[in-house]
Design a protein with these regions (language model features):
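Donor nucleotide-sugar binding/catalytic pocket of nucleotide-sugar-dependent glycosyltransferases
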Residues: 6-83, 143
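Conserved donor-binding/catalytic core segment of Leloir-type glycosyltransferases
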Residues: 51, 86-117
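Nucleotide-activated donor-binding/catalytic signature segment of Leloir-type glycosyltransferases, i.e.
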Residues: 130-154
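A short alpha->beta transition loop at the rim of the catalytic pocket in nucleotide-sugar-dependent
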Residues: 160, 183
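Nucleotide-sugar-dependent
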Residues: 165-174, 195-196
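Short acidic/histidine- and often glycine-rich active-site loop of Leloir-type glycosyltransferases
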Residues: 176-177, 191-201, 205-206
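Short hydrophobic beta-strand element within catalytic cores of glycosyltransferases
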Residues: 185-188
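A short, well-ordered alpha-helix in the C-terminal region of glycosyltransferases
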Residues: 203, 214, 221, 227-242, ...
Length: 256
């Protein structure tokens, strides 16, 4: 299904019942057997510290009864050098980058975007590509397909903002981090670890996951907001640098 399910917290057999792994009975059976072998107690017995890329994941581990004292939160980092730019000039469009599949919320984005006068550039491929092309026909929505980093940097870097409309949990999505490091604010769904990465009104905005009506309104607000693009980039490049990550990682290790 397309709804977020947490039934395995109370009964791991649900992974078999719902065929949660690739919608395959065999893959789901193997996942169940692995989960039964590597129980929480067995994992805790051989682990000094669990490192989670988001507070969201840390909270889910606590929900699963992992020892809170062993759980640490450390956000992902990226290669900052690849995001550096000479200018932060913007063009009058917004963008999406990611897989074109139902859980990414791309259908909700298309539904909202078709009712708006703003150009939307979509980067990526996936199972919904042909369906989305048909849905976007006659609108100001451009599906660009798969792109390599130099093209992604150019498109995302010049966008007024990037939309991350996920409808399933995201842990610590690099699409948000990379966009901000390019000086591009993010309009993200209020789900998983996405809200932790967005300072509303300063580095982006949030909307209710799956709510096309609210997304439509927020897109208009994003275009109307005078974001400080250079400051977004400089702040993100400092926050998500490898040096900062390694310093925090070393602090965790030396505390053991």
């Amino acid at each position: 299904g397309l709804q977020v399910c947490e039934e395995c917290f109370s009964d791991k057999r649900k992974v078999r019942e719902h065929k949660c792994m690739k919608n395959s009975a065999l893959a789901s059976f193997l996942a169940y057997k692995e989960a039964m072998k590597w129980t929480r107690m067995r994992l805790e017995a051989v682990t000094d510290a669990f490192i989670c890329p988001s507070r969201f994941m840390a909270d889910k581990m606590v929900q699963g009864n992992f020892d809170k004292q062993k759980i640490n939160t450390l956000c992902n980092f990226i290669d900052i050098a690849k995001t550096r730019k000479d200018d932060y000039d913007k063009e009058n469009y917004y963008c999406y980058i990611g897989r074109l599949s139902p859980e990414k919320g791309i259908g909700t984005l298309i539904e909202a975007a078709k009712r708006l006068p703003y150009p939307l550039k979509i980067i990526g491929g996936g199972s919904l590509e042909e369906t989305l092309r048909a849905a976007a026909a006659g609108s100001d929505i451009e599906l660009l397909g798969y792109k390599h980093w130099p093209e992604i940097k150019e498109i995302v870097g010049k966008a007024r903002f990037c939309v991350v409309p996920s409808e399933w949990y995201e842990n610590n999505p690099l699409s948000v981090i990379e966009s901000q490091c390019l000086g591009t604010p993010v309009l993200g769904s209020r789900i998983g670890g996405i809200p932790e990465l967005i300072d509303e009104g300063k580095t982006g905005m949030l909307f209710e996951s799956g709510n096309a009506k609210e997304l439509k309104a927020r897109i208009g607000q994003m275009f109307a907001t005078p974001f400080e693009y250079r400051q977004i980039a400089l702040g993100a490049q400092k926050r998500y640098s490898a040096e900062r990550y390694y310093a925090k990682l070393l602090k965790i290790y030396t505390s053991l």
